[in-house]
A protein has these predicted regions:
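His/Asp/Glu-enriched, well-ordered alpha-helical/loop segment
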Residues: 6-23, 27-28, 33-37, 41-44, ...
Length: 184
């Protein structure tokens, strides 16, 4: 389905501001090489949820080959190719206990391990700074919000205070981070 959507829309041009993509595709998980090449050369953006393979690894391994599972949600590859990408939780679409918790998805993108430790494609890991950017500064323009996600003059000054420094903890602990305060 993703390949078909890319095939139909990859030549579209943005009709909004310069930073808002012409097309945003959701649930991008396993696109073909052709779809990735077209997306990289288009005004398209992809929103993805590596939390699905993290939370539902048993189903993935039951229905797909191990190599297909490891090739799914290749966020690092997409970024290297120049594909505009954001992360989202897509709550409540996963069976995970707290589907709207962004820290589980951040952990999944950074560690590329499922909840049970299964390797879900180490070559597609991204660092925590990149993962946070894909949830904030990159995600806003995907829906037309071009003044959010960065603390700088002219932008909305919304921010959160966490119970620990997410940039300085072991990646296996990212899902344990808690929000202490939200400032809007």
């Amino acid at each position: 389905a993703i390949d078909r959507a890319v095939d139909i829309t990859w030549k579209e041009k943005s009709w909004m501001s310069d930073n808002v993509p012409a097309v945003r595709l959701e649930h991008v998980a396993m696109p073909s090489e052709t779809a990735m090449e077209r997306a990289a050369n288009s005004d398209m953006a992809w929103s993805t949820q590596p939390v699905f393979v993290y939370a539902e690894i048993e189903s993935y391994l039951k229905n797909l080959t191990e190599s297909t599972v490891k090739a799914s949600y290749p966020v690092a590859k997409w970024l290297d190719m120049g594909i505009r990408t954001s992360l989202s939780s897509d709550a409540p679409a996963t069976s995970w206990a707290a589907p709207s918790d962004p820290f589980v998805n951040l952990k999944s993108a950074v560690t590329r391990k499922a909840w049970d430790g299964t390797d879900t494609g180490q070559e597609h890991r991204i660092d925590i700074e990149t993962a946070i950017r894909l949830y904030t500064a990159e995600a806003g323009p995907f829906v037309g919000f071009t003044d959010v996600g960065i603390l700088k003059p002219g932008y909305a000054a919304d921010f959160i205070i966490l119970d620990r420094d997410i940039l300085d903890i072991p990646s296996d602990e990212i899902d344990q981070v808690k929000v202490l305060e939200t400032w809007i």
